[in-house]
């Protein structure tokens, strides 16, 4: 596969996000700028190899092969070995959703919380987070716990982009969030109250590297 073709394949796969899990061919073309004939050909190849799946409404979504590859990543393997027993123990004690997230993103401006493990609680309020999903750092408990571990240089770069409101309770003011990060470092855990999902609260603790 040539570098040019590989680049186009990656651009197509990158189109799919948590907010846009399924796309039409036209939407893929608009997002990538790839010529229609090339887009049709590449999409057909991706479907043949289970990297994309064609839905009944002539839309496409990520295929099972991507999930299978993701499960083989060193991160996923380490998570299953080291963290899953602890996630299950928390779930058994609380009956609530239990998540494990890591900091992900090439730069502080692009950083987010990547959920790499989840146990769903039978008594808990549904949330938008899922294994493999990404949520903003400033609006989630796990995100705030991760932010609290960053140094000042990293935080200055992170705060150079606006903090968007996910709900009316989301903290979007830098000074307010910085004060909360100081409190998190002092007490050792982070909290949120309806900042990402209405009706939901969370408690998060930063962990040593697995």
Feature roles, as predicted:
Residues 61-160:
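Amphipathic alpha-helical effector-binding/dimerization core
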Residues 52-53, 100-101, 207:
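A structural signal for short hydrophobic beta-strand segments in well-ordered beta-sheet cores
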Residues 158-168:
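Short, flexible active-site loops
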Residues 1-76:
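N-terminal helix-turn-helix
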Residues 169-210:
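Extended hydrophobic
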């Amino acid at each position: 596969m040539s570098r040019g073709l590989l680049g186009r394949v990656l651009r197509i796969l990158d189109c799919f996000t948590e907010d846009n899990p399924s796309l039409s061919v036209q939407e893929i073309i608009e997002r990538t700028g790839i010529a229609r004939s090339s887009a049709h050909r590449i999409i057909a190849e991706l479907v043949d190899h289970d990297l994309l799946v064609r839905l009944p409404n002539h839309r496409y979504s990520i295929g099972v092969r991507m999930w299978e590859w993701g499960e083989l990543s060193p991160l996923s393997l380490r998570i299953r070995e080291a963290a899953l027993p602890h996630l299950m123990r928390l779930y058994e004690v609380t009956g609530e959703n239990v998540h494990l997230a890591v900091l992900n993103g090439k730069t502080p401006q692009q950083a987010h919380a990547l959920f790499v493990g989840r146990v769903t609680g039978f008594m808990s309020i549904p949330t938008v987070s899922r294994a493999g999903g990404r949520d903003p750092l400033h609006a989630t408990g796990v995100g705030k716990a991760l932010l609290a571990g960053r140094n000042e240089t990293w935080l200055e770069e992170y705060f150079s982009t606006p903090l968007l409101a996910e709900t009316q309770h989301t903290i979007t003011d830098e000074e307010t969030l910085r004060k909360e990060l100081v409190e998190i470092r002092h007490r050792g855990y982070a909290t949120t109250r309806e900042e990402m999902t209405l009706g939901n609260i969370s408690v998060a603790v930063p962990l040593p590297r697995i």
